[in-house]
């Protein structure tokens, strides 16, 4: 057997590539280099681990940021979804209900009525041979003494008839109550609870202007039989100014009329259906309104007394006459009216904010006037009223007639609203209970329709308001009803308002007008601006003369300041008494004039057995 060395040589001889190669292992060098290599490998692994941790941290941070962003987006989406749900439930659903009622119920009915109306007109204008033509005498041969537009008269008459029909059909579904309003039984002897509900929901032009921040002032509102009318001054800011620093205001006098509707929100909603907007002019400063028979009538004039001269009355005074139907029609009018005095004793006319009525095609208002025979007929009455403890009106300098020593009488203004009637204002007058201030007079129709209620508002911290009766036939007569005091030594018909004691209530800063409610028993409402609470309030006072009871409800205002004006108008609706108010105050913080408009629902519940 060959030795090991020979076998190694033989191996390298057979393998050519390694024939001249020798591997020499240096054990000392291996012992030195092996730890260095291990340290290098460990260092590289450590750097890799740090890099991986850094990458993981960056990705974790990005994931956290993305998660927060997704959460914010989800929160925003949830809020938007809730807002959409609110809009659908509380806004769109009632709106769709209204649209459905209009489209599905009322519109087809109105089209049916309109079709019947047109069909009747066709039959009317194309009658059978035996038809009596006397019914269309006005359209064929109007009387010569009446000056009318022959071509348009029949069309305008048809338009007014159609409007009346549409108004009646629209009001069929309303919940207007014509009976007692306070919802109390006569045998209620226990305590009562008064609850209120406020709403500023409206579909009116004034609501739009108020929402835009326009200045609204001198607003009066009138309601009746499911309709409403109002007039006010509005100042609109310039929207097209070239430079934002330049701001100017254009003033307008606005008239609007509409119906009071139930839109599924639980409150009555004023829905404007017709309006007129005129640039502010001197003859539009003071306006009085009358509502009825599906139309609104207004008389406006400058804010100053009107001097009456028999024979040429109204020559120097411009009186604006406005008539609007609940729906616009060619019969709407905006023109100047003339005064016609049939009484030569009249010499002065004093108009402020008055509410009137429309009956038998005629608008009627009651206003203070002066007569040349005032001292002859009422001199003794005034003298006796001012003898012992003279009330403030005896030495008043707040109103021109009283300052001049005149004794105002009651004037009744009427204007016919027919298409064939000229815009002429007739005036008659008569003396009655003493008139002590010029805060306005309002007319209301009594429940039985045999007379009118004539109200004068309270005088702040001085006198109570009065309710008188006014009868036109056979002759004008004004008689006291409540809240007046007889002056025995002044003659048979000598009455004054009820004056308060010298201790005035300093918390009551202003009184409103006095509103008569449509009920069998005489019921009326007035309001005061009260500052006795932390929050200023409009306090509504409800009086029932038939039940010898009274109630009140304070409505807290979101504004504070010195009151400038307070006007209310009340009506029954769905077993509640609702009162619309317009309150204007000088803000105690900013010194600017601000207003508050809305309706307050008052429900009085008897808690007795």
From Swiss-Prot:
Organism: Rinderpest virus (strain Kabete O)
GO terms classed as biological process: symbiont entry into host cell; virion attachment to host cell
UniProt name for this protein: Hemagglutinin glycoprotein
Transmembrane regions: 35-58
Gene3D superfamilies in alphabetical order: 2.120.10.10
Protein's membrane topology: Single-pass type II membrane protein
GO molecular function: host cell surface receptor binding
Residue ranges, Virion surface side: 59-609
Glycosylation sites: 168, 187, 200, 215, 395
Major localization listed first in the record, in broad terms: virion
Gene: H
Intravirion compartment segments: 1-34
Functional summary from the UniProt entry: Attaches the virus to cell receptors and thereby initiating infection. Binding of H protein to the receptor induces a conformational change that allows the F protein to trigger virion/cell membranes fusion. Down-regulates human MCP/CD46 cell surface expression.
UniProt key word Hydrolase: no
Subcellular location: Virion membrane; Host membrane
Protein keywords: Glycoprotein, Hemagglutinin, Host membrane, Host-virus interaction, Membrane, Signal-anchor, Transmembrane, Transmembrane helix, Viral attachment to host cell, Viral envelope protein, Virion, Virus entry into host cell
Family per record: Belongs to the paramyxoviruses hemagglutinin-neuraminidase family. Non-sialidase subfamily.
Stored Pfam families: HN
A single GO cellular-component term on record: membrane
